[in-house]
């Protein structure tokens, strides 16, 4: 059984708890855990380059005493492998009755500011120094590595990767190129009902292989600039599969170098630098917006300088469809919002779907519009005087970086975007570059996503019903480029193309556009 008064350096003189072993483990050491269930006073902190290795995946179980706190705090070069994470087994249900809100099985050590704010908690056993993690004396970041583990902690987060808790500032200044804020993973099963499989925030990054999420609230979540590459993975049951939400804080700033005409997809930016004043090259995964002065444009009556991106309308939510008989299915009401007030604006178009009972069930967005001002009203109006209440969802308009040139000694770089800039931009206009929350995945498997987090009700033979729209959610500027297969074998390439194997058909927005482009009047006449 071991004893925490033992030296811990020999198997016959082993420590009893992982926390005690972690307190003496130095860089390069491996904590070997023999089979058993270990109830630990957590968080357990690890020094740089310390490994924790269980005897086998099904033989070693970690049970945290503090269910609202992280289990392991890892740093540069740490390895966690061959472990189970679980709630106490005294509920007769394998520990699933115990909730673990905000508990990360593996996380970076929080900063003092986060601890003071009560957002996260400092390690109480093992290496208890406060975060953030850094690259250590090596001067080179090596991502913590999680391999061959299973998370059974209900409501928990398997990998909680907060970029604010990791940087490359070991010597007093950030070592460029090492500021990766990253973890890597191979084979980490998330059977944490109503939890999150992997959470990435604040410009964190991860490379994830063989992540299997089961009955989670969100399988993989990227927010505030978190990004990941996801390979050979699966999301089964639960509420949401993959979700990218929002953009991060400002990374780079600069000024437009020369007057640039409308409909250009590249622009020269001078003095392009990060928050510490160092000239930087913009990169794929960032989005830019211009702090234009509205007085420079003749097609808007608005004034002032923009400090946030302009917007488009992503969708219209039906809060209340109205009373029976309010609307006519044969003549649906008009749905409108105030016109966008930015330069080169486009008015959105919507189509209401009305049930036989005369209530609004949903709204189709025919055109998202363009260049709504950040502080503009998005009140949704419905003609006909019924009682429906609708609400607009918006996304920021960012010009995403395709390529950029190396900055000169004055920070001058030319950025080419994936989109065209619809309006002119004058020299001297300030710009901001922000990290996009993004999940990139190929061949992802979805099964019954949207059926809920109770596995006893979400499976199909208990009546579980999947919601296809919940497989991938990209909102508020987030992106999820993906290919996937669902429980029916239907193959999707992003949001625009579906290969339906049940009906042997191809459908989707992008397919329809391609067909329309090919079926010219001449082709139709020849046929």
Report residues per predicted region:
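Right-handed parallel beta-helix/beta-solenoid
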Residues: 1-20, 37, 55-56, 508
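Short, T/G/N/S-enriched strand-turn elements that build extracellular solenoid repeat scaffolds
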Residues: 18-26, 39-47, 52, 70-74, ...
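Extracellular beta-strand-rich solenoid/capping regions of secreted or surface-exposed proteins
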Residues: 19, 23-27, 39-53, 60-82, ...
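All-beta strand scaffolds that present successive hydrophobic residues in beta-strands
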Residues: 33, 51-54, 79-82, 116, ...
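Feature marks extracellular polysaccharide-active and adherence modules
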Residues: 34, 41, 47, 53-55, ...
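Conserved, function-critical positions that sit in or immediately flank catalytic
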Residues: 255-446, 450, 454-456, 467-469
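Extracellular "spike/adhesin" assembly and maturation modules
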Residues: 456-527
């Amino acid at each position: 059984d071991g004893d925490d008064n033992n030296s811990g350096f020999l198997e016959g003189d082993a420590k009893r708890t992982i926390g005690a072993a972690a307190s003496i483990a130095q860089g390069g050491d491996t904590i070997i855990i023999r089979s058993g269930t270990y109830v630990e006073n957590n968080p357990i902190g690890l020094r740089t380059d310390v490994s924790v290795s269980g005897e086998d995946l099904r033989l070693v179980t970690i049970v945290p005493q503090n269910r609202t706190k992280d289990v392991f705090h890892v740093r540069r070069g740490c390895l966690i492998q061959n472990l189970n994470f679980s709630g106490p087994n005294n509920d007769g249900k394998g520990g699933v009755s115990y909730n673990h809100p905000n508990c990360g099985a593996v996380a970076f050590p929080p900063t003092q500011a986060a601890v003071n704010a009560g957002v996260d908690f400092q390690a109480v056993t093992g290496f208890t120094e406060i975060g953030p993690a850094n690259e250590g004396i090596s001067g080179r970041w090596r991502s913590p590595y999680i391999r061959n583990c299973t998370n059974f902690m209900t409501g928990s987060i398997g990998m909680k990767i907060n970029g604010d808790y990791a940087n490359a500032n070991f010597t007093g200044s950030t070592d460029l190129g090492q500021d990766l804020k990253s973890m890597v993973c191979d084979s980490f099963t998330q059977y944490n009902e109503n939890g999150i499989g992997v959470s990435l925030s604040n410009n964190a990054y991860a490379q994830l292989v063989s992540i299997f999420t089961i009955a989670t609230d969100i399988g993989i979540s990227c927010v505030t600039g978190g990004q990941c590459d996801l390979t050979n993975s699966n999301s089964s049951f639960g509420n949401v599969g993959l979700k990218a939400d929002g953009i991060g804080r400002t990374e780079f700033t600069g000024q437009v170098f020369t007057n640039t005409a409308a409909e250009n997809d590249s622009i020269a930016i001078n003095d392009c630098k990060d928050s510490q004043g160092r000239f930087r090259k913009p990169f794929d995964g960032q989005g830019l917006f211009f702090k234009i002065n509205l007085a420079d444009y003749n097609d808007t009556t608005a004034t002032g300088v923009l400090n946030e991106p302009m917007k488009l309308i992503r969708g219209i939510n039906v809060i209340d469809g109205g009373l029976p008989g309010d609307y006519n299915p044969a003549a649906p009401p008009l749905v409108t919002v105030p016109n966008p007030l930015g330069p080169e604006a486009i008015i959105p178009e919507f189509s209401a779907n009305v049930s036989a009972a005369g209530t609004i069930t949903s709204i189709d967005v025919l055109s998202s519009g363009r260049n709504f001002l950040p502080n503009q009203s998005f009140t949704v109006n419905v003609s006909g005087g019924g009682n429906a209440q609708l609400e607009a969802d918006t996304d920021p308009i960012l010009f995403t970086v395709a390529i950029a040139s190396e900055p000169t000694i004055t920070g001058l770089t030319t950025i080419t975007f994936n989109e065209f800039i619809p309006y002119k931009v004058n020299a001297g206009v300030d710009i901001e570059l922000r990290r996009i929350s993004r999940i990139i995945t190929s061949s992802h498997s979805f099964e019954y996503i949207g059926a809920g987090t109770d596995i006893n009700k979400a499976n199909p033979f208990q009546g579980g019903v999947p919601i296809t729209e919940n497989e991938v959610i990209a909102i508020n500027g987030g992106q999820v480029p993906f290919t996937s297969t669902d429980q029916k074998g239907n193959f999707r390439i992003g949001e625009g193309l579906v290969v339906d194997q049940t009906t042997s058909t191809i459908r989707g927005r992008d397919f329809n556009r391609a067909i329309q482009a090919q079926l010219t009047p001449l082709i139709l006449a020849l046929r």
